């Protein structure tokens, strides 16, 4: 299933102690991957991406210290968890959480999150 989840904002969400957004639920097919369209990413301002279950609970191996980290800007930047791009073995819908991170994260813009096989 190809799905597109667009952020409700492109800029850093001011006024939040933990700047992030969470997608609606997404049903993943065995060959699906997550991609981000984002800019102004760097070592000092980057994004982390986590997977949550339907009840917003972090999924082991895809959240916290296992979160994917994006430090390069681009239109279809692949999100990789421990060098794994394909999201196999998910029988239930998931949510995608994108977090702003780093001392210069206020400059980072997120335009879209894509879920597709390629």
What does each model-identified segment do?
Residues 28-35, 91-93:
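Extended extracellular/luminal ectodomain segments enriched in beta-structured repeat modules
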Residues 1-21, 46:
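Catalytic cores of secreted or luminal carbohydrate-active enzymes
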Residues 104-114:
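Edge beta-strands of jelly-roll/beta-sandwich modules across compartments, strongly enriched
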